[in-house]
Amino acid sequence: MDKSDSASAGRNRRRRPRRGSRSASSSADVNFRVLSQQLSRLNKTLAAGRPTINHPTFVGSERCKPGYTFTSITLRPPKIDRGSYYGKRLFLPESVTEFDKKLVSRIQIRVNPLPKFDSTVWVTVRKVPASSDLSVAAISTMFADGASPVLVYQYAASGVQANNKLLYDLSPMRADIGDMRKYAVLVYSKDDALESDELVLHVDIEHQRIPTSGVLPV
């Protein structure tokens, strides 16, 4: 073998590692694409799971969205017999309803027991037909149809149950203050008769600014 053949053979031997490194790079590209696809699927899953009126989420305290404030309504359910129901539409103060076209982004409901509370209640916010009289039969049907996600609040010896709040996102619906009368807070007293002095419900409605506070309450 002459020198030219020897040099050619040497060059061929030197190319093999480069072919190997290109193969490793190709493998890394494939892994990166797989990882990117997995992240994309995860993002879609998370986006689909963000809270809506039908899929609420537990919250603590959150800052209002920029340009938004909130109005609070306090509800004290009257005595509710064991296995019975209570419903109350969301009627905001006149000072707020005069701005009926202001958008509503979220509704937060907070359940706070009074000292005598030692039972279990189911609580939800639900859009109800204008024709509904919120009778026991009507509310019972709403709880039974499976379309009403609920906060199950149980007696906690230490005081307030850790998860005592639900946040409903109304942004996709473009709901406004004028629409709030179409929504109601519903309560089901599951195990015992609920006395009128046992429970307080705070409903915080986050809407476009009619300036007051900037933080949803704890």
Swiss-Prot record:
Q: List the disulfide bonds.
A: none
Keyword RNA-binding assigned: yes
Q: Where is the composition biased (Low complexity)?
A: 1-10
Q: What Pfam families has UniProt attached to this entry?
A: Cucumo_coat (PF00760)
Upper lineage: Viruses, Riboviria, Orthornavirae, Kitrinoviricota, Alsuviricetes
Record protein name field: Capsid protein
The entry's family comment says: Belongs to the cucumovirus capsid protein family.
Q: Name one GO molecular function term.
A: structural molecule activity
Look up keyword Ribonucleoprotein and say if it applies.
Answer: yes
Looking at the UniProt entry, the stretches that span the membrane are none
Q: What is its main location?
A: virion
Q: A single GO CC term, please?
A: viral nucleocapsid
Residues the record lists as N-acetylmethionine modifications: M1
Q: What is known of its domains?
A: The N-terminal arginine-rich stretch does not seem to be the major RNA-binding region that allows formation of an infectious ribonucleoprotein complex.
Please list where the region (Disordered) is annotated. 1-28
Alphabetized InterPro entries for the sequence: Cucumovirus_coat, Cucumovirus_coat_Asu_sf
Q: Where is the composition biased (Basic residues)?
A: 11-21
Origin: domain of life: Viruses
Q: Which organism is it from?
A: Cucumber mosaic virus (strain M48)
Q: Which UniProt keywords apply?
A: Acetylation, Capsid protein, Ribonucleoprotein, RNA-binding, T=3 icosahedral capsid protein, Viral nucleoprotein, Virion
